[in-house]
């Protein structure tokens, strides 16, 4: 998934010291913990050792204010970073996040990247046909809401990375790429297995223009949304034993 890709990118010498903003739906900031140094856990709402953990209220009602504070802290770093990485929750609505990240004119969006899990898209959304309307959506309320959020994220994407492509047939991967390109014709489509896409491979992709993104948000009536999808709950299960899906099911 996206956290695995981000951890892979940070192994690159050029990105090792890049600050990371982690926008997390949960109350615990697990992704920020994964990206932070083991001996320096993140502090909610603050930049600590170049990792900013924005979860809980910092991911929702205080997002704009918290991002402003973090960007100010980043601007004081020495040496000054060339770029800032931001990982957001899968339940994030894109326009409020874009507004928060671009409020400080010293920063601009180089890429707006959406990751799509190939196996989930294959299993739950008919390889993207549900998103395009070619196939009717499931009656499952959760899947219907997930498809709406994903389609909205893709609407603003400059890059779409289809992850875990090794879990489905090549024909399904091709169908997914076509469906996603139909939703967002201007986006670069990248295919990834085992976090195989590197950030420099996206250099040829142009940066999205903020005025175009704003027009898109206005066109679809998305300018007054909250930062995360409504009616979405998160649950964290802690267990010292190694993860096994059968035990999770039980």
Regions found by a protein language model. Give the residues of each.
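Nucleotide-state-sensitive switch-loop elements of NTP-binding domains
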Residues: 3-148
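C-terminal accessory "lid"/substrate-recognition subdomains
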Residues: 135-250
